[in-house]
């Protein structure tokens, strides 16, 4: 199976497994990826997801060998994106565990995620530049929002490889981890997020996503509206702090 779902506690790991194709995504694989994240979204027990590419490569993009074979990626204005879940807006966070290359459509999958944990020898890039294949899974939208227009233009126009250290320094990668540790460290981070009060975490995440399309006044109102909705959870947390929990920067209740 090119896509499988694994669960540990509140953390769901979606595994992309086409190592013989460097985890390039064809049409059926894109559909399976989208379905996997729909299952995650609808699972009340699942709080955070990790997307990981098996075999040492995150994803080499769309499988160009599938074009014209009946297994090509679906390209239409409606429905799922060509790479699968890239048009979805989930209510829960997703972390990309990046080993090896996250390039072309694979970069766009990583950009769709909320956070990116990258191994020290990982490489990001718009490698589809050399083939004349456009970014149509959110790359021209999410990349400049994430790292700024100037840096995004550099990556998009040149198609150059961006090593993990540079990606981290520009804010494209959120964590750098040793080679071979991306999945484990992403799942560890996911477990930490899953331990937080979830209504508040999801409300703040939604406010961050919404503010990109709103003026400041509207964004502030939206933030307050969501905050009111989960304030009871915050009051419980304040009571625990007053009782001595979580002092000195600790996330533990003791």
Where do the model's predicted regions map?
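Conserved CoA-thioester-binding segment of acyl-CoA-metabolizing enzymes
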Residues: 1-54
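Hydrophobic/aromatic residues within transmembrane alpha-helices
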Residues: 14, 51, 63, 109-111, ...
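Glycine- (often His-adjacent) and acidic-residue-rich active-site loop
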Residues: 21, 31, 53-90, 102, ...
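Conserved hydrophobic/aromatic "anchor" residues
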Residues: 37, 58, 124, 241, ...
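Hydrophobic/basic alpha-helical segments enriched in Actinobacteria
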Residues: 43, 56, 73, 197-198, ...
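Crotonase-fold acyl-CoA enzyme core
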Residues: 88-199
